[in-house]
Amino acid sequence: MVNSTVYEKVTYKQIDDMKHALGFDKRKVRGIKHRRYEPYRNYFNTGERDVDDWEQLVSIGFATKSRENWYHVSDDGKIFLERVTGVSFLPVIQNK
């Protein structure tokens, strides 16, 4: 469950990085009353310069790490993004 006291620790850059990890494109948001987005991915390769930002997201539970420099937005991270953007994030599209 997302603890609202950690919200103030998240920077705008981290929010943008989390949206980028999910492939977020506001032009592909569906619905008017119940806005939703179906991500086609959930991964972010940090290289070397974004590692600290993502490690902070991992420490507060908004991301997970799969291997060196590869991160994924966690379920709590998606809940946080839903509250920030007003858009529900559906499960990642699997290859069809």
Describe these PLM feature segments.
Residues V2-V51:
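Short amphipathic alpha-helical interface segments
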Residues A21-D25, G61-F62, V84:
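Generic structural signal for hydrophobic core residues of well-folded globular domains
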Residues D75-K96:
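Short, amphipathic alpha-helical interaction segments positioned at domain boundaries
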